[in-house]
Amino acid sequence: LIRNWIDLFNCETVTYLLEPIEGHGLWDRKKVFGELPTKSDYEGQIAVLTRATIRLSKLKQFWKNVDGVASKMAGSEGFINSYGIGEIPWIKQATFSIWQNKQAMKNFAYQMKDHQEVIQKTRKENWYSEDMFVRFKITGCTGTVNGVNPLKVKL
């Protein structure tokens, strides 16, 4: 049935094969990837899932800060691609991003001023009722985005 819709709308699909290597936090009060170390030695191509449940009283502050950070992520060194995922639109949000290596991802996450400021605001102003951060080793990728396999273009 899904294949019929994909064909009808001429949609592209891409599938990433992933191995969770490090992370922390909960998804609906569960450790959905099991017990993970908070750090690993893996430094290669990496995918990151950041997921949060935003407090209703903090929605305006959260969304006011999204566009500025998202636009800078796309131009960051080592950035390959990202996908926004809305489990419950506007409230339960996730970003799945792919990077050439862990260092490039960390440079964006912890060295880019705008992102650093947003991280500080989320903690200081208690934006989230729950959050989860998981990093994955990418073991494979099939399909296309805009006509190309996103990992083959950047290799």
Question: What is the role of each PLM region?
Answer:
Residues 1, 7-94, 103-113, 131-155:
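Short S/T/G/P-rich N-terminal loop/turn motif that feeds into the first structured element of a domain
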